Amino acid sequence: MTQKEISIIHPRPSSIVAALYTLRDLNVDVAILHGPPGCSFKHARLLEEDGIHVVTTGLDENGFVFGGHDRLVEVINKSIELFNPKILGVVGTCASMIIGEEMHDAVLEANPDIPVIEVEVHAGYHNNTRGVLFALESALDAGIIDRKEFERQEYLLIKATEVEKRFGAASKEYLAPSRGDLKYKVAKRLIELLKEGKKGLVIMNAKKETGYMFADITLAVSEVAAALGKKENLVNMANIDPELGLPRVRQHAQYIMRDFIAHGVEIHEIIGGMDEYPIAGEKVSELIKEKYSDYDFAVITGVPHAIPMENLQHMELISITNGPRQVLPLKEMGHEHVLVEIDLHPKTLGVSEIVESEFGATLREVAKEA
């Protein structure tokens, strides 16, 4: 083991689940999990709220010994009969990969007349981005995405892994979960800054559908600033370029921009697509250096740790994440106030409009008392 490598002992995201979410982003209609009935249950159920059917071959002890080829063929045919999908996904699990299941043989035998994205993956990878990459490689082979988009996604995955290892939940051997600072106290401090006429940046650097809730914080800050007559002191940035990303990701950006416009909130700087959270921070840093170096504070939502500290150090930082294990790394980076939106992800699945956040709701209520 090299000096830079660490052995992480807190639970880490699963490559199997990452593959499932990638199939969702590709607008796959049905994903078949080839493995035990309980594998990835929570996320499989949540994904069904987001428009993708997730079914399982339900391998048991007999299947572990004798294999599940026939069962996979059966479930492929049953899925086509039940759901009439335009694109089908087949995803491996620890069990099916350990026993050496050849999923491709089952797909050939079933011979569906639609594209099939086969993802041979298990949860034994240290970086869950491997599941994304495997799904994208198969999507490329199936003609669902082109080489240019694949290479773009591959680059983003490399950068995402780097960010997590340097400043995220993969940066330490063990990170205890935390709820962060009290939202009420931070809301009061933010209102003080606005009342004092301080100039602030509101930066949304969100990962895909999580933006539906992080965008509400941009709305709330804008609403409160407007009520105080200080809206002109804010500059809003967001990674909501609707031309970048896989199909579902581009759609998220379109919906969030639509809602910003409907609420009269101007996004002054578009900093990238909703899958570009690992690299959008570089653009933010450049913008601050060139145009906003005299600003006093920043409210950063989504993946704050992906934004370099170089041009933020002189600002008071209020950062909101949905990762309880992200609090300590952000504090160590120099983020003075760190908040956690608990259970954000389940609340942003299957939606197509901005969802109220805990901090947004708190800020609005505190402002009424100000």
UniProtKB/Swiss-Prot annotation:
Task: Answer whether the UniProt record assigns the keyword Transport to this protein.
Answer: no
Question: Record's InterPro entries?
Answer: CfbD (IPR017675), Nase/OxRdtase_comp1 (IPR000510), Ni-siroh_cyclase_CfbD (IPR052673)
For this protein, the record's Pfam families field holds: Oxidored_nitro (PF00148)
Cofactors needed by this protein, per the record, are:
[4Fe-4S] cluster
**What reaction does this enzyme carry out catalytically?**
Ni-sirohydrochlorin a,c-diamide + 3 AH2 + ATP + H2O = 15,17(3)-seco-F430-17(3)-acid + 3 A + ADP + phosphate
Supply one GO molecular-function term. ligase activity
Its Enzyme Commission number? 6.3.3.7
Q: List the disulfide bonds.
A: none
Sorted keywords for this record are: ATP-binding, Iron, Iron-sulfur, Ligase, Metal-binding, Methanogenesis, Nucleotide-binding
| A biological process term (GO) from this entry | methanogenesis
Say which family it is in.
Belongs to the NifD/NifK/NifE/NifN family.
What is the role of the protein in this entry?
Answer: Involved in the biosynthesis of the unique nickel-containing tetrapyrrole coenzyme F430, the prosthetic group of methyl-coenzyme M reductase (MCR), which plays a key role in methanogenesis and anaerobic methane oxidation. Catalyzes both the six-electron reduction of the tetrahydroporphyrin ring system and the gamma-lactamization of the c-acetamide side chain of Ni-sirohydrochlorin a,c-diamide to yield 15,17(3)-seco-F430-17(3)-acid (seco-F430), the last intermediate in the biosynthesis of the coenzyme F430.
Assembly, per entry: Homodimer or monomer. The Ni-sirohydrochlorin a,c-diamide reductive cyclase complex is composed of a NifH homolog component CfbC and a NifD homolog component CfbD.
Q: What is this protein called?
A: Ni-sirohydrochlorin a,c-diamide reductive cyclase complex, component CfbD
- Species name for this entry? Methanosarcina acetivorans (strain ATCC 35395 / DSM 2834 / JCM 12185 / C2A)
